Amino acid sequence: MEIRNEIKAYIVREGMTMNEVVDRLAEEYGWSSSVPNLSGKLRRGSLRYSEAAELADVLGYDLVWQKRK
């Protein structure tokens, strides 16, 4: 699964819309409150690690590094 689709699946799983996610990111982390900006980053694959961590946080998730078996 592409990272873009995976992130969108997490958003849907949490019962949120892109607008709600962007509003929370803007409120908590000072992101632009523009859905097209987030959508563009997901489409281009240009989301920075720090942005991914903030996105995970507003969705109620932690990014975890796990050693492969």
Range-by-range predicted roles:
Residues 2, 65-69:
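Short hydrophobic/aromatic patches at helix-to-coil boundaries
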Residues 1-20, 24:
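A short, Lys/Arg-rich alpha-helix, primarily the initiator
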Residues 28-47:
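Recognition helix of helix-turn-helix/homeodomain-like DNA-binding domains
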Residues 50-64:
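DNA major-groove recognition helix of helix-turn-helix/homeodomain DNA-binding modules
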Residues 8, 12, 26-32, 66:
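Catalytic phosphate/metal-binding cores of nucleic-acid and nucleotide-processing enzymes, i.e., regions
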